[in-house]
Amino acid sequence: HPYSTNHKLAVYLSNRFKNQANFTFFDIEKLPQFSKDLLEEKNTEVDAFRQLILEADAVLFVTPEYDHSVPAQLLNALEWLAFEPFPLLEKPTMIAGASYGNLGTSRAQDHLLDVLRAPQLQAAVQSDGGFLLSRHLKLLMKIMNYLTPRFVKNSMKSCLIFFFL
């Protein structure tokens, strides 16, 4: 959603690191609910999503946390990637998220990490974790205005360097 905290974080990251990488966004809400029965059917949104991931050099998932987990739409999107040609297989992958809560999106990131390491996905997830921003109403407001403190920029930079080597 374009007004969500995590969408704003994703936009910030794409602007901040535009000289190191090209970022492409995909609206996963356009994907139909996953069903193995639909794998044989042609679906332009699913095909475009799978092709985008397949052609990407790396993938960054920016996720909120709902009920201590990942949003259903993201899990649905990952189901579409769990079949040939296995677009996430050994693909450099990072997780990021922002939240107003004390733990940020840590539980969602842990859950997403487990899913991304599943045998059908086997993404090359950054081993030292992703980028997590928590308890930070003022910090989020600054990020939304592109006035982030140095430690936030350095933290994001050290996480994203994984992709730019």
Q: What spans do the regions from the language model cover?
A:
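N-terminal beta1-alpha1 ligand-phosphate binding loop
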Residues: 1-20
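Secondary-structure boundary/capping motif
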Residues: 2-5, 34, 69-70, 104-105
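Helix-loop-strand module that forms the ligand-binding subsite of alpha/beta enzymes
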Residues: 41-120
